[in-house]
Every structure is written in C-alpha cells, then in structure tokens.
Amino acid sequence: MTSLVYFSSASENTHRFVQKLGVPATRIPLHDRAGTFEVDEPYVLILPTYGGGITATGRDTSYVPKQVIRFLNNTHNRSLIRGVIAAGNTNFGESYCYAGNVISQKCRVPYLYRFELMGTAEDVVAVLDGLEQFMESEQWHRQSQTQPRLGV
C-alpha cells in the first residue's frame, strides 16, 4: 500500500478516517512549531479543510492548516508529495474540501478524493481502491518538480 501522510486537528476527524483505512500512515504533528518533521518516501497527503477566507494581503491560504503549510514549505517534503485527499464539511458550501484544491494547484499534484468529516464506509473503499490504482500510475513514479512555497 502507498505511503500516507496526514494532518488531523484536535477534533480527530481526519485521524479517525485514516484509522478506518487500516494502512500505515504518518501523522504531521499538531505541535511542531520548528517545522522539523520530515518524510523519506513518496506519499499521498490527507488533510482537513479549515474555514478559509481572504487574508489582509489578499492571499487565501487559511483553508490549509498552518502545520501542513510548514510541512510542505520544507523543500524535501514537498518534493515527495504525489497526490492529495481532502476532508471537509458540506456546511461550508463552495469551500467544501477546498484545501485539496490549494495543495493540488500549489504542489502540482492530482486531487485524488474528497470526503465529509470522518468519511463513510463507501469513502474508505473508494480511497483504498483509488490509492492502489494510483500507486501503479505514472504520476506516482514521477520525478519531483520545482514547486513554489505555499506561503502563509
């Protein structure tokens, strides 16, 4: 099975979804202010979407948790991302799972799937099947590209 890296806030919704997958996964620490957490193999990132909104500078990065931004601003970590899966809440309308769009565009990787809150049994099956197919694809084996920093 593919390598998964995920972030889950204190609500643990994303963590519970990853547990349901039943595959090894590495969690981005909730408190890693130094930004020293690194991975050593290609991975698919699973992350929740935060509320979002336009910042004073006009940049819209608040959908992505700050811990994930720090993790991906590490050039080594960013070079190993191969795809993204996002969690969200449909109550947020157009912002539903928007963190996946941001990461996909900024890191130039496919947006593989989105699910609500902790996901359903159908989401688990879809993600496991999709990851298996993705691992066999050319995109999984691609060389890293030069990618811009996410910004804060």
From Swiss-Prot:
Pfam families: Flavodoxin_NdrI. GO terms for molecular function: FMN binding. Gene3D superfamilies: 3.40.50.360. GO terms for biological process: protein modification process. InterPro entries: Flavoprotein-like_sf, RNR_Ib_NrdI_bac, RNR_NrdI. PANTHER family: PROTEIN NRDI. Belongs to the NrdI family. Probably involved in ribonucleotide reductase function. This is Protein NrdI. It comes from Rhodococcus opacus (strain B4). The lineage of its organism: Bacteria, Bacillati, Actinomycetota, Actinomycetes, Mycobacteriales.
